[in-house]
């Protein structure tokens, strides 16, 4: 039976990055300032990304890793050649909004920014790599935040629509796979990064978050509509930070807590995939005194323009309890979870659960019956070169192999429809959560440290050759 388990022909293997974590060149060729540029490494980072502390420009005494990233803006040809050497079928990347519209509300785009991405996409096609493009990945021009309050304002719909129309028109024939917002549910956990939100003292933060979420959901529907009109070959997906919530015990209140936590996550895809707000959300808003302003036109857009596929990031499952204050916690993707005593953890406390990926795939498939795409998965670890300068990252290979097996089982034994898999940070980049460089995910090592020092030289890790073989055999090399 095992030898019959395989990945479908045309399965899209690849890797993923984000503009704000790798491009650098924050002020070159007309690019404007963005929210992620001014998020520093250090103890204030969490307060800033959660909207509790305002930082709208660079301040003395801080180091801002996104300003330079890994200098992919100047080195993308070298990097894409390495992706081509691995045999990537797809490369997920994001557009820096402020490269295209530096302030965000201009009527005409910045040609230098448009040309940069056109050249990059053509470089991908040179190696037979299909671009998978995230329109906004924790990225908002700073002017839209200081002038309008970010996604709390309906003004953002107009600006985002102009961005999308520009991208879909310019890159018609070069890009056919689009994601509207990265990890859209992170607006609840990292609202400054996810939506450019900062809160005033005494403000109803949940009200602001859900109003901004409504604007992003409508914007996503507008993008889907435009993409299909401009090029019928376009496929548009949503993107969620996923991971099943297990009940801490079989106590009914723990099971209920897990269901509630899952609903908070799936709320966004419920709207994007089904086209309407779920009843449980309306009831919860009423209980909390939240009034989300929306028009009949908004609701019609949501209904008429659902996504073609569902993409998500998966790093770990989570644990929920009816008494969370009494339970031990562990780190996770931006926000913490309760600790699962049955799982091992990474150096950053993220718990390792490949079966959880299979469970998550089945949950999403059963809930929506839409094709899926895993667009982030990987192990953040400290990689130390040996005396020969090589990275022997067998721990990363073990992690990824276990998750590849889980995908294969979900496809062959459970019948889910999965289009592709892009590992996160296929080349080392700046961590979104911590701002660190030493938390590495890549198959390609980048010589740069947490203080911005290093040659930026690229080198292949052991996992580089492993993943190359995985792709060449369409997953058959993973036993």
Q: Where do the model's predicted regions map?
A:
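Active-site region of glycoside hydrolase catalytic domains
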Residues: 2-60, 103-105, 114-479
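A short acidic, glycine/proline-enriched capping/turn motif at secondary-structure boundaries
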Residues: 89, 98-100, 138-140
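Catalytic domains of carbohydrate-active enzymes, especially glycoside hydrolases
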Residues: 75-96, 304-310
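Active-site mouth loops of central-metabolism enzymes
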Residues: 61-75, 152-155
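Glycine-rich, proline-tolerant flexible connector loops at the mouths of alpha/beta enzymes
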Residues: 95-109
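Internal amphipathic alpha-helical repeat/solenoid segments
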Residues: 69-81, 102, 113
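A common structural microfeature
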Residues: 10-12, 73, 90
């Amino acid at each position: 039976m095992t030898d019959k388990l395989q990945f479908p022909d045309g399965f899209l293997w690849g890797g993923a990055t984000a503009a704000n974590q790798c491009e650098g060149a924050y002020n070159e060729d007309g690019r404007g300032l963005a929210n992620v540029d001014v998020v520093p490494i250090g103890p204030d980072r969490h307060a800033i990304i959660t909207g509790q502390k305002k930082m709208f420009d660079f301040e003395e005494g801080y180091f801002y890793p996104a300003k330079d990233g890994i200098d992919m803006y100047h080195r993308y040809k070298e990097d894409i050649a390495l992706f081509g050497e691995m045999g990537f079928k797809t490369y997920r990347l994001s557009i820096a909004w402020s490269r295209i519209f530096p302030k965000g509300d201009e009527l005409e785009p910045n040609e230098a920014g448009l040309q940069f991405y056109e050249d990059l996409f053509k470089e991908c096609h040179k190696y037979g790599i299909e671009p998978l493009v995230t329109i906004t990945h924790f990225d908002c021009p700073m002017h839209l935040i200081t002038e309008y309050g970010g996604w709390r304002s309906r003004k953002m719909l107009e600006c985002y629509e102009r961005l999308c129309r520009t991208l879909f028109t310019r890159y018609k024939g070069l890009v056919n796979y689009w994601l509207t917002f990265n990890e859209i549910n992170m607006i609840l956990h990292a609202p400054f990064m996810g939506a450019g939100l900062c809160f005033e003292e005494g403000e109803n933060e949940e009200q602001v978050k859900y109003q901004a979420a409504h604007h992003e959901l409508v914007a996503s529907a507008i993008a889907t509509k435009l993409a299909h009109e401009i090029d019928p070959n376009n496929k548009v997906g949503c993107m969620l930070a996923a991971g099943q919530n297990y009940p801490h015990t079989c106590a009914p209140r723990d099971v209920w807590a897990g269901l509630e936590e899952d609903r908070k996550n799936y709320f966004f895809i419920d709207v994007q995939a089904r086209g309407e707000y779920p009843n449980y959300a309306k009831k919860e808003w009423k209980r909390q005194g939240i009034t989300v302003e929306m028009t009949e036109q908004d609701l019609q857009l949501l209904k008429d323009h659902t996504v073609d596929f569902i993409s998500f990031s998966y790093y770990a499952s989570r644990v929920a309890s009816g008494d969370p204050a009494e339970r031990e916690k562990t780190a996770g993707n931006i926000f913490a979870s309760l600790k699962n005593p049955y799982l091992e953890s990474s150096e950053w406390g993220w718990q390792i659960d490949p079966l959880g990926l299979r469970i998550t795939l089945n949950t999403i498939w059963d809930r929506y019956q839409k094709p899926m795409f895993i667009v982030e998965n990987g192990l953040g670890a400290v990689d130390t070169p040996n005396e020969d300068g090589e990275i022997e990252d067998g721990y990363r290979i073990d992690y990824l192999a276990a998750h590849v097996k889980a995908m294969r089982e979900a496809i062959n034994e459970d019948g889910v429809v999965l289009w592709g898999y892009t590992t996160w940070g296929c080349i080392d980049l700046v961590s979104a959560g911590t701002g660190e460089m030493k938390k590495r995910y890549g198959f390609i090592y980048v010589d740069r440290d947490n203080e911005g020092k290093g040659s930026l030289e690229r080198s292949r890790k052991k996992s580089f050759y492993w993943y190359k073989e995985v792709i060449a055999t369409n997953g058959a090399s993973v036993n």
